[in-house]
Amino acid sequence: MNVMTALVLAFTLGLGLASLNSDALKNVARDFQEIIVRMISAVILPLLPLYIFGIFLNMTHSGQVYSILMVFIKIIGVIFVLHIFLLVFQYSIAALFVHRNPFKLLSKMLPAYFTALGTQSSAATIPVTLEQTKKNGVSAEVAGFVIPLCATIHLSGSTLKIVACALALMMMQGMPFDFPLFAGFIFMLGITMVAAPGVPGGAIMASLGILQSMLGFDESAQALMIALYIAMDSFG
């Protein structure tokens, strides 16, 4: 099953569940979601370091590891700067509507940010994010609805990281790319991030399918993407 088929199936099932409003079917869907999340958390993620270690052993043997690590450091630096720019931009737009200082709004969210650094999970950070959002003057009703909903679907930081890393790897490996192809990839990635599980590394695992089908990433390129993403997962 390719990625487009899986997405169409997911949307069809979602619309069907909503229209039928069957509690039994909804419970089945929730249980299946829990199975997938537990599989990623308990099986796939613990084994990923071994897989990535093997990839780096192979690169060391071929003499590529130093040049790749140097590129990694540059990519991480660029993405960190982009994260800061994105946060300042988003909070500046919000501050225009509420006539407040965006940096004061950002400073009140620092406890949530540091919690996310430690947990590497947007879902686990929800209680702290909710509390700090209320301290920023957001009503309890709005915060209680928006924060749990958007914590795991508004993955703008994950989208930014994956797009930047994919572009850097394609340029580094001399892979052909053009704007229409990458625009389609970004669009599909945005849709995929809506369904990405809110667990450490969940976003990159959800995006592997379109990295392979749309950009032609092989197993080694996917492993490099996973390694890059995991290294930056906590800060955005």
Regions found by a protein language model. Name each.
Residues 25-43, 69-72, 76, 102-113, ...:
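Hydrophobic alpha-helical segments of integral membrane proteins
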Residues 10, 49-53, 86, 90-91, ...:
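Alpha-helical transmembrane segments of polytopic integral membrane proteins
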Residues 163-236:
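Transmembrane alpha-helical segments and their short flanking loops
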Residues 1-104:
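Signature of multi-pass transmembrane helix bundles
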